[in-house]
């Protein structure tokens, strides 16, 4: 039975990916910073013999190493990695602080890199696959998204380069780039910016709606599966046509 580690797996896209992969027969380890959220996620997934929660912060390199090691120790190996942990910060560049820069890059970029670095030796043995989570903001510019877009663009570039490094070992590395998704992160964004409405967000999309977490999750599951066995180095928009405008 295949095993996947999903960072940021206690809510949003990560939790949806955990549910989809469980349905498809995977063992699933999820990580997150808050134990109570992790326990709630395990209860929601309702498959105790095939799920495992690891408390940790992807901004900490030692925690990233431990997440991988605990997954391998508990399930006996690692076949897939999904780096869905991330934070969003909207604001004009002149209002960005050094602390903002450190926080977003530590979580969105360095956390992704660290997890992949520690996972690669284990994935090489299977071989396994990696799916990183970027954003439409990593593919095109957005007002008040210079910092966030920089982190997500870095994830895309990292994914494409790592795919070339890993290909000789038959490890595939791909990236999903969602637009706005109906997640707790989106709800927080709307609370923080009351001048932004859900309807205004929908108007950006040719399909005139926001994504559901399961739609992104199923794309992740596809990229991890043998159905995508000849796909690597791809940054795949899951954005209702937003980046096609």
What do these predicted regions represent?
Residues 82, 167, 172, 231-233:
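Short, small/polar-rich loop/turn modules that mediate ligand/substrate recognition or access, typified
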Residues 92-93, 100-105, 201:
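Substrate-binding pocket helix/loop in short-chain dehydrogenase/reductase
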Residues 140, 221, 232-245:
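Short C-terminal tail/terminal secondary-structure segment
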């Amino acid at each position: 039975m295949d095993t996947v580690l999903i960072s940021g797996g206690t809510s949003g896209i990560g939790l949806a990916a955990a549910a989809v992969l469980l349905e498809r027969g995977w063992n699933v380890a999820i990580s997150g910073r808050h134990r109570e959220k992790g326990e709630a996620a395990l209860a929601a997934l309702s498959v105790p013999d095939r799920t495992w929660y690891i408390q940790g912060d992807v901004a900490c390199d030692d925690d990233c190493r431990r997440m991988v090691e605990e997954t391998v120790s508990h399930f006996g190996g690692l076949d897939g990695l999904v780096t869905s942990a991330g934070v969003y910060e909207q604001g004009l560049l002149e209002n960005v602080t050094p602390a903002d820069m450190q926080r977003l890059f530590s979580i969105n970029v360095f956390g992704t890199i660290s997890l992949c670095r520690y996972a690669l030796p284990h994935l090489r043995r299977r071989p396994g696959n990696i799916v990183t989570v970027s954003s439409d903001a990593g593919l095109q510019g957005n007002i008040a998204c210079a910092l966030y877009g920089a982190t997500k663009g870095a994830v895309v570039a990292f994914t494409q380069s790592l795919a070339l490094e890993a290909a000789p070992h038959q490890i595939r590395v791909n990236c999903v780039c969602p637009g706005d998704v109906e997640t707790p992160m989106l709800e927080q964004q709307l609370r923080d910016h009351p001048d932004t409405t859900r309807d205004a967000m929908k108007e950006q999309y040719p399909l005139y709606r926001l994504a559901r977490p399961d739609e992104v999750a199923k794309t992740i599951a596809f990229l991890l599966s043998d159905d995508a066995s000849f796909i690597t180095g791809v940054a795949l928009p899951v954005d209702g046509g937003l980046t096609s405008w």
